[in-house]
Amino acid sequence: MSAFITFEGPEGSGKTTVINKVYHRLVKDYDVIMTREPGGVPTGEEIRKIVLEGNDMDIRTEAMLFAASRREHLVLKVIPALKEGKVVLCDRYIDSSLAYQGYARGIGVEEVRALNEFAINGLYPDLTIYLNVSAEVGRERIIKNSRDQNRLDQEDLKFHEKVIEGYQEIIHNESQRFKSVNADQPLENVVEDTYQTIIKYLEKI
């Protein structure tokens, strides 16, 4: 039984922490792997350093680098795992590009979708968990946790508000694969809600 489950959300939504905790619960009963974008494979990790830690770059260059990393990650890690019948939990996927580069950067959602559809070749997630939190709360968490801020973290509040608007538009248009989880609650509640959402999906397939 394979399933491709992606996690989306604005900066400070707690995605990485939630995925880790959900993974350690799921692995007791399912053949599951956890991965991330950009990254997940050596080439992807090198691209991650460029787009998240490097200097400012042309917005279309940024979008193409994310798409290139995505393709390499799919071919080397995600697709083989799905063929082996695994459950794949992925921290970010195509919807991040649509929300960040397509909407917030202003390239255009459909333009970025076309670029990424070439990269993913039809492989959309079976289920996408959206961790819903406001830009203000996300920013406060990043500052409070003193985490290392990447290039996207350092964008202004208006940019992050646009990211959320982009996600809302995507979810409205593709509501069948999205499940929204309230991430503005205690972490253990977010983890439990996310875990139960995934279990309900897996029990149906």
UniProtKB/Swiss-Prot annotation:
The keyword Magnesium does not apply. One of its GO terms (biological process) is dUDP biosynthetic process. Keywords: ATP-binding, Kinase, Nucleotide biosynthesis, Nucleotide-binding, Transferase. The keyword Nucleotide-binding applies. It catalyses: dTMP + ATP = dTDP + ADP. Its EC number is 2.7.4.9. GO terms for molecular function: ATP binding; dTMP kinase activity. ATP binds at G9, P10, E11, G12, S13, G14, K15, T16. Pfam families: Thymidylate_kin. GO terms for cellular component: cytosol. Gene3D superfamilies: P-loop containing nucleotide triphosphate hydrolases. HAMAP family: Thymidylate_kinase (MF_00165). Belongs to the thymidylate kinase family. NCBIfam families: DTMP_kinase. Phosphorylation of dTMP to form dTDP in both de novo and salvage pathways of dTTP synthesis. This is Thymidylate kinase. The lineage of its organism: Bacteria, Bacillati, Bacillota, Bacilli, Bacillales.
